[in-house]
């Protein structure tokens, strides 16, 4: 256990940020899974709207520093390729 006041504060701040990051990552994974299910069902209209949501979630998580921007770009590219392959 930390004895120094600033170390105690850092523990609290880290716990808050960890919780926030978990929430954002969970929402991101859910959005991607919903898109994947729509692609598997071969539902192009639903997949297109879910792609927009997944891309938005990826951009938001990258801008907040939860995931790396290159990882977000790579995932968006792969999701777009899956969407375009449905045509």
UniProtKB/Swiss-Prot annotation:
Any one Gene Ontology BP term: translation
Pfam family, one: Ribosomal_S20p
Gene Ontology MF, one: structural constituent of ribosome
The keyword Cell inner membrane appears for this protein: no
Record key words, sorted: Ribonucleoprotein, Ribosomal protein, RNA-binding, rRNA-binding
GO CC field: cytosol; small ribosomal subunit
Family per record: Belongs to the bacterial ribosomal protein bS20 family.
Function: Binds directly to 16S ribosomal RNA.
Name of the protein in its database record: Small ribosomal subunit protein bS20
Organism for this UniProt entry: Clostridium perfringens (strain 13 / Type A)
Highest classification ranks of the organism: Bacteria, Bacillati, Bacillota, Clostridia, Eubacteriales
